[in-house]
Curated annotation (Swiss-Prot):
This is Small ribosomal subunit protein bS18. Gene3D superfamilies: Ribosomal protein S18 (4.10.640.10). The gene is rpsR. InterPro entries: Ribosomal_bS18, Ribosomal_bS18_CS, Ribosomal_bS18_sf. Belongs to the bacterial ribosomal protein bS18 family. GO terms for molecular function: small ribosomal subunit rRNA binding; structural constituent of ribosome. It holds the Pfam family Ribosomal_S18.
Length: 92
């Protein structure tokens, strides 16, 4: 079969499409996200503090990842441990 040539398949202008997109340009500003549980006056992570634990759980009862909640790695481990303890004691 003979191949068909598509119209409009040629590049228009000297710049490629990738150069025009802003997502491929480096980010000028980098903001550091602070952990909400490491700040001064932050509540202590405890398996009895159910109101705090429910903030870091989905509606289905799964533990939310730290990339969504902005929690540090150390506090994420404490959170997951206390959520699991609260589940075992049927507090959640």
């Amino acid at each position: 079969m003979p191949s068909k040539k598509r119209a409009g398949n040629k590049k228009k202008g000297s710049q490629s499409n990738f150069a025009k997109l802003s997502i491929f340009q480096p980010n000028k500003y980098k903001f550091k996200k602070t952990c909400p549980l490491s700040a001064k006056g932050a509540p202590e992570v405890d398996y009895k503090n159910i109101r705090l634990l429910k903030k870091y759980m989905s509606e289905n009862g799964k533990i939310l990842p730290s990339r969504i909640t902005n929690v540090s790695q150390k506090k994420q481990r404490e959170l997951s441990l206390s959520i699991k303890r609260a589940r075992n004691l049927a507090l959640i």
